[in-house]
Amino acid sequence: MTKEVVVESFELDHTIVKAPYVRLISEEVGPVGDIITNFDIRLIQPNENAIDTAGLHTIEHLLAKLIRQRINGLIDCSPFGCRTGFHMIMWGKQDATEIAKVIKSSLEAIAGGVTWEDVPGTTIESCGNYKDHSLHSAQEWAKLILSQGISDNAFERHIV
């Protein structure tokens, strides 16, 4: 018998969200009491556009570094297959407003001055697709996203 599962992100009505936003998906408690929080970091309005893979890949690498410089507890920040944003998994209870501020600050760094030397993991030894990066694209997407404002609410615009 196959176990019935519900995947929250496929239950979300993508036609009513208002990107860019940070949305708390869930807080889960592990078997020994550890808490993890899962966030939807939606940078692009679903079904209207998608970040090109090279730009998204570079944003991913930069966020891995920049988020950790701004807040403790990051487990992972991985892109959605639809290329409209990221899942962000954190240790402990976290607040969507604080995470939105961290994402905003990280995107500001990407938009305003990081250089190729600042992008971690861009060698054949450190990346599984090291040729598929674009700092220019990452910076242009960051500027566009920031111009729209980062909300801490997926359904009503509340810019941080």
Curated annotation (Swiss-Prot):
Binding site for Fe cation: 57, 61, 127
Family, similarity comment: Belongs to the LuxS family.
InterPro entries given in the database record: LuxS_sf, Metalloenz_LuxS/M16, S-ribosylhomocysteinase
Catalytic activity: S-(5-deoxy-D-ribos-5-yl)-L-homocysteine = (S)-4,5-dihydroxypentane-2,3-dione + L-homocysteine
Any one biological process term the GO annotation gives: quorum sensing
Matching HAMAP family: LuxS
Cofactor dependency: Fe cation
Function recorded in the entry: Involved in the synthesis of autoinducer 2 (AI-2) which is secreted by bacteria and is used to communicate both the cell density and the metabolic potential of the environment. The regulation of gene expression in response to changes in cell density is called quorum sensing. Catalyzes the transformation of S-ribosylhomocysteine (RHC) to homocysteine (HC) and 4,5-dihydroxy-2,3-pentadione (DPD).
Protein name: S-ribosylhomocysteine lyase
Domain of life the protein comes from: Bacteria
Details of cofactor binding: Binds 1 Fe cation per subunit.
Record key words, sorted: Autoinducer synthesis, Iron, Lyase, Metal-binding, Quorum sensing
